[in-house]
Amino acid sequence: MRKSIAIIGGSIAGLSAALFFASAKNEELDFDITVFDEGKADLKAAAIYNVPFFPKGAKADEIYTHIKAQIASMLEVKYIDSKVVSISGEKGDFTVNDEQGLGIKADYIIVATGANKSDIKELEDFVIPHELIPKPNKFCFKHHGRQIIKEGIYAAGLASGVTTMVACAMGSANEAACAMGSANEAACAILSDIKGAVSVYHDTPTTRN
């Protein structure tokens, strides 16, 4: 079985979701992953000191390069440097349209566009103020259940209403609800929907031997 996933937003949340799907690929389930990104992520203005496993003071490009290399070792992903302007269709038959006129088909969509206001057509009615970021003009998507904006479309990262772009649920020193964690939750929710039962994926030391 092969499922297509469009990820709108290629910063830490979007790439974390792509990495989850890459690791979950097996003989029974494969993925076509397309990541759209405008290149305007807030992470580009940050240096990361509070997340384990990243080099101290890691910058956005260093983080992106590392995650993309990890993804590429398991799955070929298509990256498109473009803004998504509209979504049409329904779960299992979406079309994601970008500003260049490209239309990508997808079974599922993850929206990880950060906290700036989204003007993606068909999602306008779901945009609400982001109440956990103490800055003006910050927004997220109204969602329910497992970060479902509407059937087949999931919010991740700041767009899901969490308060930090990078830090994970690793204790009181970091935010419990976070971009990478919410992205993996969205990916787990999609995997569960595909399999028809609550599903997660973890490797063991011998999984890939």
What are these regions (language model features)?
Residues 5-62:
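Beta1-alpha1 glycine-rich phosphate/pyrophosphate-binding loop at the start
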Residues 46-103:
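N-terminal Rossmann-like dinucleotide/flavin-binding domain of flavoprotein oxidoreductases
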Residues 40-43, 101, 144-147:
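Short secondary-structure boundary/capping segments
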Residues 107-138:
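Glycine-rich beta-alpha-beta "Rossmann" dinucleotide-binding loop(s) and their flanking helix/strand
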